[in-house]
A protein has these predicted regions:
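Topology signature of small-to-medium multi-pass alpha-helical membrane proteins
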Residues: 1-181
């Protein structure tokens, strides 16, 4: 349970962030199970990549769970760590990485045959579902570099929320001042 000294507005923000991470993580686990069920051949490398995806989505669920309880402070710190691997995604000479546990707003620069045109492209991608892509030595030689603006914003948001909650906690514990509601 979130402590009573936290203002209603900040409790709501903690709860929304917590549920966002839980729902995104659960959706990611379900998508990963679905992809796994469609995979015809599973080598040790593919199994390792699936384990990595499950671990990342499970971590998102864990962060969300912490935010909904008394360990919200640890949940905020871990939530920042959860957002970091969601910032940058890339594809380059057969190697690719992309991960997001929820929505994404990405600025993307791409070049190659896998793009809309075969030249240099710049675009904005919006996604509402969790996504992961890990490629090792694939035949796709296109180039793509994306930055997830939502992940960057969430890191900023979480950091500001953490500062505000720390201020409320200090006011409550040391000065005995009740927070503004």
């Amino acid at each position: 349970m979130i402590p009573d000294f936290i203002s209603k507005q900040r409790k709501t923000r903690l709860e929304l962030l917590g549920w966002y991470q839980i729902v995104g993580g659960i959706a990611g686990v379900l998508v990963t199970f679905w992809i796994l069920s469609k995979t015809e051949q599973i080598t040790w490398v593919i199994a390792l990549l699936f384990l990595l995806a499950f671990a990342l989505y499970s971590f998102s669920i864990y962060c969300g769970k912490l935010l909904l309880g008394a360990q919200y402070s640890r949940g905020l710190s871990l939530s920042i760590l959860n957002q970091v691997p969601q910032i940058v995604s890339f594809a380059f000479i057969g190697y690719a990485y992309q991960y997001n546990a929820g929505a994404a707003v990405e600025l993307a620069l791409s070049y190659g045959s896998g793009t809309v045109s075969s030249g240099l492209n710049f675009g904005v991608d919006f996604g509402m579902m969790p996504k992961w892509l890990f490629s090792i030595a694939s035949d796709d030689l296109s180039f793509k570099l994306s930055v997830n603006l939502l992940a960057i914003y969430l890191i900023y948001f979480i950091d500001k929320l953490r500062e505000a909650l720390l201020h409320e906690k200090v006011n409550h514990e040391i000065a005995g001042i009740e927070p503004e509601i």
